[in-house]
């Protein structure tokens, strides 16, 4: 168990170092982000902006919909992170 924690910490450190190097060497952010990822994020942020304009969260259905959208976004973010991590491993390996 200790080894798993150490390996995970090393992987996180490696990802952080790689990300900092990519900005220092001038890699474009567009290289790592696909256009449709940005479009999905923009559409989602627009939905969140509309949802945040609700005046009253006392309506349970509206609140449930808002938190459902948040949950969906974090699932997409997790999948996107896994894909980017796999791409990072390919570039490093």
UniProtKB/Swiss-Prot annotation:
Belongs to the cationic peptide 03 (latarcin) family. 05 subfamily. GO terms for molecular function: toxin activity. Residues 23-64 form a propeptide. One of its GO terms (biological process) is defense response to bacterium. GO terms for cellular component: extracellular region. InterPro entries: Latarcin_precursor (IPR018802). It comes from Lachesana tarabaevi. The lineage of its organism: Eukaryota, Metazoa, Ecdysozoa, Arthropoda, Chelicerata. Has antimicrobial activity against. Gram-positive bacteria (A.globiformis VKM Ac-1112 (MIC=1.1 uM), and B.subtilis VKM B-501 (MIC=0.6 uM)), Gram-negative bacteria (E.coli DH5-alpha (MIC=0.6 uM), E.coli MH1 (MIC=0.6 uM), and P.aeruginosa PAO1 (MIC=18 uM)), and yeasts (P.pastoris GS115 (MIC>37 uM), and S.cerevisiae Y190 (MIC>37 uM)). Also has a moderate hemolytic activity against rabbit erythrocytes. Causes paralysis, but is not lethal when injected into insect (M.domestica) larvae. The mature peptide (65-92) probably forms alpha-helices which disrupt target cell membranes. Cleavage of the propeptide depends on the processing quadruplet motif (XXXR, with at least one of X being E). Residues 1-22 form the signal peptide. The keyword Secreted applies. A motif (Processing quadruplet motif) lies at residues 61-64. This is M-zodatoxin-Lt5a. It comes from the Eukaryota. The modification Leucine amide is found at residue 92. It is found in: Secreted. Keywords: Amidation, Antibiotic, Antimicrobial, Cytolysis, Fungicide, Hemolysis, Secreted, Signal, Toxin. Expressed by the venom gland.
């Amino acid at each position: 168990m200790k080894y798993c924690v150490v390996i995970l910490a090393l992987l996180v450190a490696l990802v952080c170092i790689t990300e900092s190097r990519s900005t220092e060497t001038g890699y474009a952010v567009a290289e790592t982000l696909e256009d449709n990822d940005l479009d999905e994020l923009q559409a989602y942020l627009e939905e969140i902006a509309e949802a945040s304009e609700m005046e009253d969260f006392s309506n349970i259905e509206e609140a449930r919909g808002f938190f459902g959208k948040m949950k969906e976004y974090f699932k997409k973010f997790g999948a996107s992170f896994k894909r980017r991590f796999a791409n990072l491993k390919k570039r490093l390996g």
